[in-house]
Every structure is written in structure tokens, then in C-alpha cells.
Amino acid sequence: NAVKNKKNYEVHFYLTLLVKIVITVSVMINSSNLIDQINHTKRVIESARQQNQWNLSILNTSVSPSEKVQKRLNEIIGSLPDRDVYNYTSPEILYQTTDVSKTQRTDFIDNYMEISYNVLEKVKVVDKNNKRLKPKDFTGKAVLLIPQKYEKDQERILKELGMEKTDIYFIKDRQVYQDMLSPGYYAIDPIIYAHKVKKQLWLPTGEILYSSKGASVLNEAIEQEKIDQSTLYLNTLKSENDVSVYNEQSRTLEAIFFVIMNISSYILCIVTITVIYLEFRKKEFGVYALYHRIPKKAILKFLCFNEVITLLSALMIEKEFLCFVLFEIVFCSLAIWKYFCRK
């Protein structure tokens, strides 16, 4: 029975170690994801707060209006001053980070965005001399704003985009722009096609944004034309941003609860390993206790063997998680010390 119990304890010990490997890796990965999620949520809130100050709106449609209504709306939109209408097309690739070093070089087409000149009032773009570009810097002719690092690739860029006759204006490298439609997401070093504002109901790509004055005029037109506002309505950027903020906060809370569950399992696993080890070496430690001695070599071997798992996991995932190693050493040492105090 003694031999059988010893084997059982040994099997349980190594099985628990295997479980610990899985749980430790899971805790660290999920903790790392939680930190990223918290940082992203902060950026979403900050970006949304900034965008809300612009007081812009988007015209949404669930059903295409009749040709007569479309014509009327196009007339009204066309009559709006340029300052009340903005065109914006996000690039295909957006990042959740503003750290340029963490981004990868992408195809020109994937990192291409379109804006009307007046968007430069909202989004800061600087030229190669670090001077901020303004709408008045351009005559109205469409232009490609290209990061200076692509200077040798300009012919290829024009060819790939099908814009051989478009003028090029070089801008400073490594610029980061907050996306106007997605708070907390950023365009990094994109090629920007800037053009005169297009005032029409829809664009082939991207969105048309309206100032509060432009939105007010459109709302009046929608009411006058007696259009069903469930099929055609103006939605403020603020209301859409509020949804984005709520969704990110919900994801953060879910991640927090998940990590709490992971950490609980992790602590339980450490307790189980320590208890099994002490039971496994109970007779040997009992002899040491009779002579009021502590088997330092055996305990040190256990601690080292146990902490190697946590140490390797931390080095592979996040070095900041090396604090888990210290926690385990302190926890296991206290548990073993308390065990010997009772003997």
C-alpha cells in the first residue's frame, strides 16, 4: 500500500504539473490580452471624445429612396457650402496602436485613403518640412499626398493606383492619423488622395460627413419630402462612437472576469502541487522534523523545478510576468514553512 500510495502521489504530482503548464500559459496570455484590451479601450474613449467635438453626422439608408427623392436630396446636398460637407474613405488596413515600429509595410493599395481637402482641418497632416497642410494650400486639383520614404516608388504608385496624371505632394514619414470613422483605430503612413469635396447622396467608396448645419438642412428636407425616417436618417458620429465605446468596455469587463477565473485556477493549481508534494515526501520530512531540521536541498529542488515552468512561460510571453515567479516562490515557501511549524 505504501508503494502504491507513493506511485499515486507521484502520478498526481506530475499530472498537476502538466495542468499547471496549461493554466500558467493561459493566465499569462489572457493577462497580456487584457492589458492590450484596456489600453485599446482607453484609446477608443479618448478618440471618441475628440471626434465628438467635431459634431459630424452620417446619412444612413436601409432602403434606396425613389429617383425623385434622390434627385431632390442631391440638389440640397449640392447647395451646401463646402465647409458643411466632408468626404472620407478609410484605408483597408487600420491599426489599434500608434507605435509605428509595431506595424508592417503593406501594399500601397491597402494603405490608401481618400479625403476631401477640408478634412485637413480635422486631421493633422504635415509636409516634409513639418508644416501643417491646410485646405487653402491646394488649388482644388486632386493630389496624392505620399510619405517621403516612397519617393523612389512614385511612378509605381501612380501606375498601381491608375493615377498617372495626378500631382504628387510629399509629406513627412511615420505620421499616424486617427481614423474618422473608427475611434481607437489608426492609419499609419498611408498614401492620401486629397480632392475637392464631392457633394452628392452617395460615394462609390467611403462616407460623406455633414456638419451640424448641413445635417440640420438635410433633416428639414427629409421631413418636407415625408421620407420614412426608418429608411433614411442622419446619425451623429457621437451616437456611433458611444456604441463603439460601450462595446469596448463590455469586452474589457469580459476579459477581466475571464482573467480572474484563470488566476483562481492558477492559485488552486499551486496549492494542489504544494500539498501533493508535501504528502508525497511526508515520511521523509517527518524524520527531518524529529531532529528539528529542514530539508533545504529537497525544498530548493522542488521550488526550482516548479518555477521553471512559470519562468519559461513569462520569458516567452511577457517579461513583466516574471513577478509570477516571485509570487510562487513566496507562496510555496510560506506553505512549506507553515507545514514544518506544525510538526
Model-derived segments and spans:
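N-terminal membrane-entry
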Residues: 243-267
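Selective transmembrane-helix segments that form parts of the transport pathway or gating/packing helices
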Residues: 300-318
